C-alpha cells in the first residue's frame, strides 16, 4: 500500500503551500482559493489514512503495541515542538509583524499575546498531531467498536451494496456526523473551554472522529475499500452544486433557519463535497503511484520532518525575504520552494543521520549499535 503512504506524505507536505500564505500575510485570491479547496479534503483524507494504518498495524502487532508505538512517534515530536520550536516561531512571527522584540514581553504574558499570534494559537499546526494522538490512545475503543454486532451488521449491509450506493451512504453519514460533532462541541464544551487554541483541539477531536473510524472500516472491509477507490462523476458534480448553492446563499439560509442550523448545513455541504474529493485522490494515487521508487520513498520518509518544521522555517524565511521586499505576494511565492528545500535538507543532513534527532523530530526508536 505504498501509494497510501505517498498520498499521506502529499497531504502533509502541501501544508507548506497553505501556511505560506498565513505566515506571509498575503490576501491574494489565488492562495486563498487553494487554501479553501484544500480544507475540503486534506485533514479528513489524512485521518482516514491514519485510521487505516492504525488498524493495519493493530492487526499485525496488537492494539496495545501499536498504541505505544504511536505515542512515541506522535508524542515526542509534539512535546519538542510545543515546548521549544513553537514558542520560538511565535516570538519571531510577533516580533516581525508587531515589532515587539523583547523576549520577556512574551515570556511573562501567558496566556495572552504569546498564545495567540495572528490567528494561530500556541499549538500552531501541531494541533493535528495532538488530535491523532488522542485517537491513538483511544484506539482500543475504536477497534472495540468494530467488534460489536450492530456495527458489524452495518458493515455486512454495506458489503451487499453496489459501489455507488456505498459512496452515498458513507458521504451522508460522515458529513452528518461531522455536523453533529460541531453541534455537540457547541452545546457541551463551548462554554467550558471558551474560544481559543485548546477549544479548537477539542472541536477537531470531536468532528474528525468519524473519519478515523471510517479509516478502520476502510481497512476491514474490502468492499468499502473498493468503493472509495472508485469515482462517481454524477455524485461528485451533485456534491459540488450543493456546496456552491450553500456557499452562495449562506446569508439567506442563516436568516431563514437561524445561525446554528445554517452552520450545520454549511459544514455538511463542505464535508459532503470533500468526501468525493478524497475518493478521487484514492483513485488517482492507486493508479499512478504504481511503484515505490527512490524519489517517492524519500519524499514519503521526509514528509514528517517537512510537516513539523515548515512553519518555523517559513517564518524565518519570510523574515529574511521581507528585508528585500514588502510585497507579500512575492514573499509568499518565493518562500514556498525555499521552505521545501530547507526542510528536505534538514531531514537529509541533520535529522536522519542522528538517532537522537530522529527520535525527537520523527518519533523513531533509538537504534542500537
Segments from the language model and where they lie:
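Alpha-helical transmembrane segments and their immediate juxtamembrane cytosolic regions
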Residues: 1-369
